[in-house]
Structure formats: C-alpha cells, structure tokens
C-alpha cells in the first residue's frame, strides 16, 4: 500500500521523531535496492531477509575511477541516517569514465566502510546519522547502478526481477 509507506512513519514520528525518520528512510532504501542487479539483491536477502539498508547522502560525495570489472571508490559521506544499525548502505558518487560523467550509487556491506563517530546533533541524535569514510575500495560491477536516466541505453538492472517497484 503506497499510502502506508508515508502514513506509518508519520504516525511513529508523533511519538518519536528519530524513529519515524529511520523507518521512512529504511523503507525507501529497500525499494531502491529493487533496481539493482539480481546478484546483489540475492546476496543481501538470501543471507538476511531482515537486513537493514542505510544510505550515504544521495548527493554524490565520493569519486570513483573505472577499473576492470568495477570501480575504485573513495570519499566521505556525511549524514548517513541509520548507518550504525544497518547491515548495508548505499553511497552516491560521480563516475568519470573518459570524460563522460555518470551519477551512480553502489551498495556496500558494513564491513567495507568506516563509520565515523561524528553525529552530535541534539534534535535527531537517535538517528545515528554519522559520516562514513571509504578509501580506495574496489567495488565490483554488480554492486553498481547508474542513475543517469537521461542517457542512451540506460537500464535499471533489477527490473528484470522486480516488475512492480511498489
């Protein structure tokens, strides 16, 4: 139910804003995973059907270099809500592939990034929206998804598996 996707976090937020914020974010992140390659979806859900997915801020805060079968990712992402309780997280970055810039996200397991203990905000302290640092990490192609939908030949790999994203 699409309306429930909005209603439930709103109701929870009446009692606890931080919890409502995390519920809303986590729901949208699980939906985003549906457009990724089937291999990473199965890697996540087969291992743990209750896996939580956070997101490094959707604005690209990292950079990547194209290499054979993937990328090398480096960056500092701030305001990663729910990162401390999540098993996985998305990270946005700009890929410069021989002068062609392409906005991407990748998904990484918590063992692949460093969480910085820098979230010291009074109002939404319990969201655990710490920063994340990644330095020269190889990310295989199947964990990447381009979100530059206006370019020729763009596809969402996961649509072969998930016909209805809602």
List where the protein language model places each region.
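DPxDG-like acidic metal-binding loop motif
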Residues: 76-113, 117-118, 128
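Short Gly/Thr-rich strand-loop-strand
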Residues: 61-63, 117-123, 131
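Glycine-rich beta->alpha junctions and the first turn(s) of the following alpha-helix
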Residues: 122-123, 129-166
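Glycine-rich flavin
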Residues: 1-86
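Structured core elements
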Residues: 72, 90, 131-133
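Generic structural signal for alpha-helix starts
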Residues: 16, 37, 109, 139-141
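Short solvent-exposed loop/turn micro-motifs enriched in small/polar/acidic residues
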Residues: 55-58, 99, 125
């Amino acid at each position: 139910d699409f309306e429930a996707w909005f209603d439930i976090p709103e109701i929870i937020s009446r009692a606890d804003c931080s919890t409502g914020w995390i519920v809303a974010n986590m729901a949208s992140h699980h939906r985003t995973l549906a457009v990724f390659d089937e291999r990473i979806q199965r890697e996540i859900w087969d291992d743990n059907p209750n896996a939580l997915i956070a997101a490094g801020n959707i604005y690209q805060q990292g950079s990547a270099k194209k290499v054979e079968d993937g990328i090398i990712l480096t960056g500092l992402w701030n305001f990663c809500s729910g990162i401390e309780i999540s098993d996985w997280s998305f990270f946005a970055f700009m890929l410069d592939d021989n002068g062609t810039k392409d906005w991407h996200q990748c998904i990484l397991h918590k063992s692949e990034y460093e969480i910085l203990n820098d979230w010291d905000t009074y109002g939404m302290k319990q969201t655990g929206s710490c920063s994340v640092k990644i330095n020269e990490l190889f990310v295989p192609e199947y964990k990447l998804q381009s979100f530059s939908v206006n370019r020729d030949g763009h596809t969402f790999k996961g649509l072969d598996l998930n016909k209805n994203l809602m």
